[in-house]
């Protein structure tokens, strides 16, 4: 097993239940020549590369579109038997997000090079070290407020009155990283398929915050944050290195990340997928 990365030192943070020498890390620059060489003599390739926000070194188009295309081409050249690509839920229907567009274009490009590839589109992924539950848990350490982004929903019109809907909430169907990993392994035998994947429970921001705060034994105030206010805040946060929130992420949050079909797909492989309620207490 070989793990390809741009930063080999990150391998020090991983621990594997394997014999010495069975897992190795290889540091490469992401260009076609290097990728072709790295994939030589391997039967199965997983592409798990992705970013949530752009910076000077990493742009959505390169990471989500160009790299998958190069990996798919390298897999074809090396006659790889199976190529599994990790994408994201609903990117095929979201048209106003740079993240979603780059992800979807990546799917299109890799299919041109490796038509038998398997694409997996999960909802929000949670587990030890994630960028979702851990972020809000850490935020609750020092902030008395937790943001309910997208609540209330506000409809603007020509009239002086506007519609405020506090019942409109962004919904997620989080999938446990352990279940997702098992699902990906089972995809090795599949050809030319696309699967949505989602967990067993649908949660709003406030319900996820409830679980986090209950586990950490904290009390915080939930602050309603309509999208237009969140976008203004994100604009200023983007001026900082490593922004906590971006306008493109706000755009993504306009769309629910849920899928009944996704849960059905997961249950075909994992009979009893773990819920966020069950797993959260094991790592927070």
Task: Write out the residue ranges for each language-model feature.
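N-terminal Rossmann-fold cofactor-binding loop
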Residues: 4-9, 28-30
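Conserved beta-loop-beta element that borders a ligand/cofactor-binding pocket
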Residues: 108-141, 145-155
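Mid/C-terminal beta-alpha module of Rossmann-like enzyme folds, strongest
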Residues: 180-246, 259-284
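Substrate-positioning beta->alpha
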Residues: 131-132, 153-188, 193-196
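A short helix-to-beta-strand connector/capping loop
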Residues: 18-25, 114-115, 218-220
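NAD(P)H-binding glycine-rich loop region in Rossmannoid oxidoreductase-like domains
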Residues: 19-70, 74-77, 89-94
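Short-chain dehydrogenase/reductase
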Residues: 61-65, 96-107, 111, 126, ...
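Conserved Rossmann-fold NAD(P)-dependent oxidoreductase catalytic core, especially the SDR/UDP-sugar
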Residues: 52, 62-113, 117-123
């Amino acid at each position: 097993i070989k793990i390809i990365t741009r930063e080999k030192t990150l391998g020090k943070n991983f621990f594997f239940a394997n014999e010495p020498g069975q897992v190795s890390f290889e540091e490469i620059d992401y260009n076609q020549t290097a990728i072709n060489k790295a994939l030589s003599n391997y039967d199965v390739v997983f592409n798990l590369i992705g970013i949530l926000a752009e910076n000077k070194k990493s742009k959505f188009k390169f990471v989500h579109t160009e790299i998958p295309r190069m990996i798919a081409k390298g897999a074809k050249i090396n006659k790889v038997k199976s190529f599994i690509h990790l994408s994201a839920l609903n990117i095929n229907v979201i048209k106003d997000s740079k993240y979603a567009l780059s992800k979807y274009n990546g799917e299109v490009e890799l299919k041109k090079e490796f038509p038998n590839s398997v694409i997996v589109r999960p909802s929000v992924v949670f587990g030890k070290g994630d960028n979702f539950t851990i972020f809000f848990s850490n935020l609750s350490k020092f902030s008395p407020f937790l943001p309910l982004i997208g609540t209330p929903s506000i409809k603007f019109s020509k009239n002086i009155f506007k519609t405020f809907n506090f019942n409109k909430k962004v919904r997620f169907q989080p999938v446990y990283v352990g279940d997702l990993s098992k699902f990906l392994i089972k995809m090795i035998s599949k050809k030319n398929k696309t699967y949505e994947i989602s967990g067993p429970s649908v949660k709003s921001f406030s319900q996820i915050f409830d679980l986090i705060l209950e586990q950490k034994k904290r009390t915080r105030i939930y602050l309603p944050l309509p999208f237009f206010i969140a976008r203004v805040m994100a604009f200023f946060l983007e001026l900082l290195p490593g922004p906590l929130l971006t306008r493109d992420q706000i755009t993504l949050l306009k769309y629910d990340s849920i899928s009944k079909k996704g849960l059905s797909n997961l249950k075909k492989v994992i009979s009893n997928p773990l819920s966020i309620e069950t797993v959260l207490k094991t790592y927070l």
